[in-house]
Amino acid sequence: METKKKVVLAFSGGLDTSFCVKYLSEEKGYDVYTAIANTGGFSKPELEKIEKRAMELGATAHATLDIEQEYYEKSIRYMVFGNILRNGTYPISVSSERIFQAIAIIEYAKQIGADAVAHGSTGAGNDQVRFDLTFQILAPEIEIITPTRDMTLTREYEIDYLRKHGITADYKKMEYSINKGLWGTSIGGKETLHSEQTPPEEAYPSQITAEGEERLKLTFEQGELAAVNGTPYTDKVEAIRAVEAIGAKYGIGRDMHIGDTIIGIKGRVGFEAAAPMLIIAAHKMLEKHTLTKWQTYWKDQVATWYGMFLHEAQYLEPVMRDIEAMLLSSQRNVTGTVELILRPRNYTLVGVDSTFDLMKTDFGEYGEVNKAWTADDVKGFTKILGNQIKIFYNVQKRNKK
């Protein structure tokens, strides 16, 4: 009897990967080993439900790979250090976690001696590149299988296929592709395919339940979130969850991201990311008080590149480690507490309390009184500061420009 080929499928329990389990096991005759790399977006009951679904669909075995701490240490904290928002909007939630999921999946595939590795990405998005590139770099000898992409399947086709094979599910809910993670949740569906539409309220996993106002205090130590409303957290993942629980009930962090995909087309996705938006906003305000002008300028430059490389599947590029070293160094004085006021769908930054606050000095108060220089000092400084510009305009005048 011929031994079946062993394939590891990156499994989320969603429509595409559910189709892949059934298709690869029944149509292609593979032994399908499903694996979910949890970056912190799923609770224990949710993970148990995903495992049950995988086995019902025909998986030979299922593995849950817990990588939330690794994801924080190797990605999230650097995204906070860099205040990274793609196009000034999106905290690259899915973009960042996909690489770590791909790394975990391919390492598991090597561990069990798999012949192939599979994922459910379509041919029109970024994830196909993130998975494929990571697999190719870390295990070039293992075959990559992508049924959804290779067969150019629609969500409607996959739903119909599963129904015909007797698979029951909430197919109405499956009309939306929801990627839930520690650093935000993305929502894709028929509305995100059209520039003039947006997903309906019910498409979002979190619903707005809070009214009025609430004050929130976030404390940072060397750039990392250390306390929420005075409660200290040594586990940074739990600190993020605490902020998410507070902010999500106000609907904070909901938006539409429109960006350029790795493959060169425009893409739209809805998202909700209360914790990332609040943490980044507070962290950025604290940096304004504790970093010098040139620290801020150069950190912003490299952070933009870091976010772009992370989005475009370049996490394993060696320069990323160099950028991380600079981002880490920049945070040595980013310590203090930031207060915010939360309201339904928005928030206000109130102020900062930090012993490293560069406004709290004996040199002067902006727009008020100077204590470290005289009026004549300023007159002389201004005269020298304008020298080159004065020379330029003098030359222009002589040349009648």
Specify the residue positions occupied by each region the protein language model found.
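Nucleotide-activated chemistry modules centered on ATP-dependent adenylation/adenylyltransferase
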Residues: 2-401
